């Protein structure tokens, strides 16, 4: 799938808000309000991604928005918990040393000594740094099923090779 066709989930709808078709928005973007910078929104309706335009949005105990053409509460309620997506090509381009999390999923993780630790299965934030969840190889000699590796540039993360889909880390395989 080309970047032009790739669909990225950036949030989801919460409950309806008011009687005029407004919906609460749960943003998955780093800066929650930036979800409104990405246009058009794609919403999966009956198995198909359909384009929608945001007519208006505001802050109210979180974020709420009004979609163009959605004017009554009852119709808005049918959108509760639906995902909000955008095409990947509307996201900002990053510099060579920056990555979207989605780019790291599935990458092979190896130590600087060549020991294969597994593949990136998930990533989560902590107060100080992001953490890679690496699903270990089935035949791992250390009996690990997964490893949590801090995403600390230069100290732990030595190299990220987009072409080879590989991350090199300075990490003890025993952990």
From Swiss-Prot:
- Coiled coil ranges (UniProt) are none
Q: Which NCBIfam families match?
A: 16S_RimM
List the protein's name: Ribosome maturation factor RimM
Q: List the InterPro entries hit by this protein, alphabetically.
A: PRC-brl_dom, PRC_barrel-like_sf, RimM, RimM_N, RimM_N_sf, Transl_B-barrel_sf
Q: Which HAMAP family match?
A: Ribosome_mat_RimM
Q: Which domain of life is it from?
A: Bacteria
Q: Keyword set for this entry?
A: Chaperone, Cytoplasm, Ribosome biogenesis, rRNA processing
What is the taxonomic lineage of the source species?
Bacteria, Pseudomonadati, Pseudomonadota, Gammaproteobacteria, Vibrionales
Q: What the protein does?
A: An accessory protein needed during the final step in the assembly of 30S ribosomal subunit, possibly for assembly of the head region. Essential for efficient processing of 16S rRNA. May be needed both before and after RbfA during the maturation of 16S rRNA. It has affinity for free ribosomal 30S subunits but not for 70S ribosomes.
């Amino acid at each position: 799938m080309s970047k032009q066709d790739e669909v990225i989930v950036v949030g989801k709808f919460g409950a309806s808000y008011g009687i005029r078709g407004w919906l609460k928005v749960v943003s998955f973007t780093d800066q929650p309000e930036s979800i409104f910078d990405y246009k058009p929104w794609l919403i999966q309706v009956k198995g198909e991604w359909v384009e929608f335009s945001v007519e208006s949005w505001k802050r109210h105990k979180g974020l709420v928005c009004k979609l163009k053409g959605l004017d009554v509460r009852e119709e808005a309620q049918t959108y509760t918990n639906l995902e909000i997506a955008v095409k990947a090509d509307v996201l900002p381009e990053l510099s060579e040393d920056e990555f979207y999390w989605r780019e790291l999923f599935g990458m092979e993780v190896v130590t600087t000594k060549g020991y294969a630790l597994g593949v990136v299965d998930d990533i989560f934030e902590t107060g100080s740094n992001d953490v890679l969840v690496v699903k270990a190889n089935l035949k791992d000699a250390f009996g690990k099923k997964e490893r949590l590796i801090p995403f600390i540039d230069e100290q732990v993360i030595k190299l990220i090779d987009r072409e080879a889909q590989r991350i090199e880390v300075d990490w003890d395989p025993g952990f």
